[in-house]
Amino acid sequence: MPIKRLDTVVVNTGSQNDQHSASVPPVYLSTTFKVDLNNEDAQNYDYSRSGNPTRSVLQHQIGKLYRVPQENVLAVSSGMTALDVILRGLVLLNGTDNHTPTIIAGDDLYGGTQRLLNFFKQQSHAVSVHVDTSDFEKFKTVFQSLDKVDCVLLESPTNPLCKVVDIPRILRFVKCISPDTTVVVDNTMMSGLNCNPLQLNPGCDVVYESATKYLNGHHDLMGGVIISKTPEIASKLYFVINSTGAGLSPMDSWLLVRGLKTLGVRLYQQQRNAMILAHWLENSCGFKPTRTNKATKTRFVGLRSNPDFKLHKSFNNGPGAVLSFETGSFEHSKRLVSSKKLSIWAVTVSFGCVNSLLSMPCKMSHASIDPELRKERDFPEDLVRLCCGIENIVDLKKDLLAAMVDADIIEVRENGKYLFNKLNKNLAVNTTIDDLHKPLSIYEEFYNQDLIRKDSELNIKSSKL
């Protein structure tokens, strides 16, 4: 039987765990389940903290997405819960009187991840060493300078600077010199449809995602999923979940099963929008380095101008739908995000939703990171992050353009024929509505292939360090 593509397998749930073979899996809200003492071996559920039929259906679906058995998958209450469970179950227990568990993580982290790592450090549960993981030589130097590394925490592209981490190369290096080091990948920015770090050669130990983002896609639930390389790893993590009650609720599990069914079509449109928008920002709006202002830049892994374009393409099926740009001015960026002209773009944190979101990370998602630390890590204070939804791309560009004009960043000239960037003096043809009749094969312009519709199996070429 031929292997089905991933956007097909997440649609079909079958009739698993339903005696009536319903076409849509039911939601089991029951807290407890009757026990048959004469047939205890046949008892799958007793208490929903330990397991629930609806959660099992979800874990089965995620297992199909990542090509692993259902028992390797665990669903929890949020993405941060997922990371907390992973660290408690696999890393913190390595602590002894003579050793504090050591974690190497990136320097462009989600604020919540930074907060959790700081908490463990303050409580002396673990030591976090931050390095630019997109620079392999820096990572290698830091890794070799430490006596023992218990965990490496990776994310690519990084959020929100969109830096590409060479995950395959880091995995080969770490597993070659320190096989016992646990390598964890936060795959939220890509989702299992675009990347499967478990199937790299060698694969990572654990992947997790905030299911609040792409997997659900509607921002009407909070959830997280953990996908382990082996059942043995999953068993350790399940112990933490069962002990603490961190499992995802039945209703949220049911909503997530439903959201997963449209992952393929949602992500296709979101990535298409992101590609067109990034090209428009860089070329028509002039957010690229110029002689008068080298601080302006568009950051997106789907742009050929991105130096890591080929690297990202080598182990991912698509670019995702998160991009960011720098205006070159903190005040102008703040005016843009605060503009009352925005009617489609919602000013809020998070990403992966069907509606488009806009934010200023230094004031929102990354506000919990100390300003001095942001400066030390070269985090641009004027950075504006865009998370594309599924709306019509022309409407998205018009809405953003109106806000940029209102913020005194862009001036529309000659009855809309040209766009003039007031901050870096770039003048370019206005292509705001040019994409109205372009075919949906915009992927081919960037990658020379239709990424979402191609076979989802990655062909990873092994190479030496």
From Swiss-Prot:
Transmembrane portions of the chain = none
Its Gene Ontology molecular function terms?
A: carbon-sulfur lyase activity; cysteine-S-conjugate beta-lyase activity; pyridoxal phosphate binding
Q: Name one GO biological process term.
A: transsulfuration
A Gene Ontology term for the protein's cellular component: nucleus
Matching Pfam families: Cys_Met_Meta_PP
Residue(s) carrying N6-(pyridoxal phosphate)lysine: 213
**Compartment(s):** Cytoplasm; Nucleus
- Judging by the UniProt lineage, the source's domain of life is Eukaryota
* Coarse class of the protein's main subcellular location: cytoplasm
Q: What protein name does the entry list? A: Cystathionine beta-lyase
Organism annotation: Saccharomyces cerevisiae (strain ATCC 204508 / S288c) (Baker's yeast)
